[in-house]
Amino acid sequence: VSGGVLVVNGSLTSNVTVTNGGALGGSGALIGALAVNGGTVAPGNSIGTMTVTGNFSQTGGVYQVEVNSAGQNDKIVATGTATINGGTVQVLATSGSYQRNTTYTIVTATGGLTGTYGGVSSNLAFLTPSLSYDANNVYLLLEQAASAFASGAQTSNQRAVGNALDTASPTATRHVA
């Protein structure tokens, strides 16, 4: 896929390569390898899982992951290995009241995982995304941003209210994103 978007909601028996200018989406199954080489992969139709019966690799490009406040998220599940060599995870969060310090599994590879993403970004103002890895998974963690409310202040009164909210927020059990 070198231009446009391929959406797989059923099954596709083929190796798929996504390059610059191309995108792959859907909640279907790829019977074959998936290689993202500078393009975009966006599992789900809204939130969903893309299954790869084979190996998954990503070199550069963007992995768009939707998450919601119910703890659900897009995910790539590979029955083979996953090899990550840079690229960016772009978190697209729906509105809602998120649990602080929620972990989402965004990649699972039965055959093992090697490498890391180069960065992660998010559309959430008050939660900071980070990534962690184990032998088979990539995890996305959304944590309370430090001085989140005060950082948006433009006046001394706004800053005072923001500081009060930042002081209270570490003990809060939920957070509005």
Language model features with spans:
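Extracellular beta-strand/loop-rich repeat segments of large surface/secreted proteins
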Residues: 13, 19-105
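Outer-membrane translocation/initiation segment of Type V secreted surface proteins
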Residues: 90, 94-177
